[in-house]
Amino acid sequence: MGQLLKKPKTKVLKQGVTLVHDTEAEKAPLKYVSFKLVDIQANAIYEETLGSYECCIVVVRGTVTVTDGEHVFSNIGTRSSVFERKPTDSVYLSNGRSFTVTGTSEACIALCYAPSNKQLPTKLIKASDVGIENRGQLQNKRLVHNILPDSDKTANSLLVVEVFTESGNWSSYPPHKHDEDNLPYESFLEETYYHEIDPPQGFVFQRVYTESRNIDETMAVENGDVVIVPAGYHPVGVPDGYASYYLNVMAGPVRIWKFRNEKDHEWILSR
């Protein structure tokens, strides 16, 4: 297994709180993005102080209460499974904040981090405020939930999005990249993918590769895996009979998502 595919490594932090993923602890080759996934039982409490990072808490499933000492967001979360395909609630917290997350049911939260040196207001990102977008055509269709797009000034660095891809389709396709700080043509953004698959015994394929091929890994990605994209193209293919969900976290020196398609495959857009 290459260094870009991360399997769940569960660690019980306290009673009722289990750390499932932690890219920083696994020494992922990233400078701007960090990602954790935490399972929380009902009435259990996860707590953290952010330091020099901002954080977006995404309620992947279940319900929780989030507080930062000034704000209390009670019983947030909208779904028992991501494959209900409806937006969820999230909370943005700026650097220097301390927060707690209390399970009001059995829940799973994603903690999406990026460096930040400017404090911004804590904000509840309601499911009803999440932009919904259908992208692509033919076998390149996907449903997108824009939690923190670059048009939303809630965050300093973070970009957060959920993508649903149905059976037999591709996403992040044609292959695109955002690994050069060359605005207005392309921005440099690192990225993580947290994957879920329905039904859960399935898998998807993801290839991460640069133009020089100094990075070139093709992975069979299973339910609950994380894929690291430090640079390069990163398409995802979904086999027949299965559906794909992934949560993307992106960040870089400038908070703009400007990508460039691989020229060899850009022709598919003109069909």
UniProtKB/Swiss-Prot annotation:
The reply to whether Iron-sulfur figures as a keyword in the UniProt entry is no
**Does the keyword field hold Isomerase?**
yes
Task: List the InterPro entries hit by this protein, alphabetically.
Answer: Deoxy-glucuronate_isom_IolB, IolB_Bacilli, KduI/IolB_isomerase, RmlC-like_jellyroll, RmlC_Cupin_sf
Q: Which Pfam families match?
A: KduI
This protein's pathway = Polyol metabolism; myo-inositol degradation into acetyl-CoA; acetyl-CoA from myo-inositol: step 4/7
- Gene3D superfamilies (alphabetical): Jelly Rolls
The job of this chain, per UniProt, is described as: Involved in the isomerization of 5-deoxy-glucuronate (5DG) to 5-dehydro-2-deoxy-D-gluconate (DKG or 2-deoxy-5-keto-D-gluconate).
Please state what the protein is called.
5-deoxy-glucuronate isomerase
The organism of origin for this protein? Shouchella clausii (strain KSM-K16)
